[in-house]
Amino acid sequence: MVRGTLDIEAYREKVESAHNIIRKWAHNTPILNSSAINSIVGCEVYFKCENFQKIGAFKMRGAVNAVMSCGITQKEKGFVTHSSGNHAQAVALSSKFAKTNAYIVMPKGAPKIKINAVKGYGAQVYLCENNEASRVETCDNIIRETGANFIHPYDNEKVICGQATCAKEIFEELNEINVIMCPVGGGGLASGTIISTKLYSPKTEVI
């Protein structure tokens, strides 16, 4: 198997650009720690509290960067994505900020509170079957009908660079971080965290 190499330095300008956008539209969330947890684990542990982010999740960073970095013509076409919750809300709110349409494909089994939140941001919600093929097919149909721009929940460079700003803010506030522990779902946050770590704190280990 051939493994490609990533030119991390080529991402510096992209991450800086993403952060300039995100500063205008999302929160620099607080970094907190707990003396109780520190005593249990025997080291200093800090939490980057993205639960205080707009829509309550880090997904806002990637979505707002993907939307706001588009040109006027692209924005006018609107945006489409598929998601069961947080990315759906993030694209919906980002599209509202951009004063354009959002077409959000969500599985029928998605929590009603998240479906209602997406609708509350003014997006059009399309319910589909609870499988990947149905999500993709529904998005493709919307794109053909509207010409809207598709924003993948994690397999999108602008989304990844947006998520990278979370770790960037950590390195701007804290010194000499030994380890960052990052959750992995689709991999957008993990990819962004690795990029920022290589750029701003290469001695830090990402787990």
Locate each region found by the language model.
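PLP-dependent amino-acid enzyme catalytic core
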Residues: 1-207
